[in-house]
Amino acid sequence: MSDPIITFDHVVKEFKTRGRGANIARAVDDVSLTIDRGDIFGIIGYSGAGKSTLVRLINALERPTSGTVTVLGTDITSLSETKLRPIRQKIGMIFQQFNLFSTKTVAQNIAYPLQLDHWRKDYQDRRVNELLEFVGLSEHANKYPSQLSGGQKQRVGIARALATNPEILLADEATSALDPETTTEVLALLKRVNEEFGITIVLITHQMNVVQQIAGRVAVMSAGRVVESGDVYDVFAAPQQPVTKRFIATALSGLPEEDRVERLHHEWSGRIVTVLIRQKDVSGTQGHELKASGQNISELIAKYGVESSLLYGGIDTVKGTAIGAITYEFNGPGWHVDEFLRELAANSDVIDFGTAAKPVAYADAVAGHASYAEDRAHDPLAADTATAPAASAAAHEGANA
């Protein structure tokens, strides 16, 4: 049974733009979202998507223009600063640039929230020592931020955010300034925070691999709206929106990069297609179930008489379950390949890069603009074309003719 700890109900946040002819900019546009207690919840989007504004609504650093925000069972939308204080004390926050006091030691930085809340000195000392040990910085207690690495600074930031025993931890691009190895270490620490203390974590990020590593659920934002949300594995395995598919492309190791696709087109004359492989059934965002995929590729190849070559691939793990991407070259009469791909696409996410003669633009292919059903309905000549491109390729070629 779900236990909501944060709820957005038709939330809108607007800002007045500066300069002549000032207009109203809508940073958050009719967002309804529930985050359950104990979750690690990822909110992902490109710059300007509205994700940072959304997280600032959680601790009322911004107030909604309309709609309601409920945190820890309390509607905070119009609370006074005095009434907000006890709620904010239960919310910790870590930042991309760490926000440490350069003139305070590690221990003093961690103790700062306790000093603001007027805790006794003996409790402050005990709590700081506990947190130093938890984040692995006991030997650095008397160092200053300038003497620390980026990863160590973020560990101090996490310890400081935990000082007052919060129930919610907001992480706004907390790993964006870190190298991949340090990012993995910091994410592992955040996972420990969640597992050992039961703290709900809200991850704001533009990096899908961050969500992949530790989040349980995810919401994808674009232009102020939540365009897709759900279980992380389900979103990875069956992304529905173009922006989500672009994010997935950055995180799946088995998906070929654009330059690799170009090389494959130079080396192979047939249809270059990447198939997303799912290990288990998932719930589609349209309310229907999508079966595990990849098991029937060989059967369909035989059914349609399509020739295939396996060119590239890889397997990742999301929430302990495998998901992968395998790239093939498919050859055969155009309508055979089209019908084969349409049936395959019924339960698999198919990324069609077209042929060397008629390639599909990489961004269009990854965003999933191709629709095989629409292709057949709108292009009656496709069945007679020896190597018919996907619908997105036909549309792309037509648009540039």
From Swiss-Prot:
It is a peripheral membrane protein. It holds the Pfam family NIL. GO terms for molecular function: ABC-type D-methionine transporter activity; ATP binding; ATP hydrolysis activity. The keyword Ribonucleoprotein does not apply. Residues 6-248 form the ABC transporter domain. SMART domains: AAA (SM00382). It is found in: Cell membrane. The complex is composed of two ATP-binding proteins (MetN), two transmembrane proteins (MetI) and a solute-binding protein (MetQ). Belongs to the ABC transporter superfamily. Methionine importer (TC 3.A.1.24) family. This is Methionine import ATP-binding protein MetN. It comes from Bifidobacterium longum (strain NCC 2705). The gene is metN.
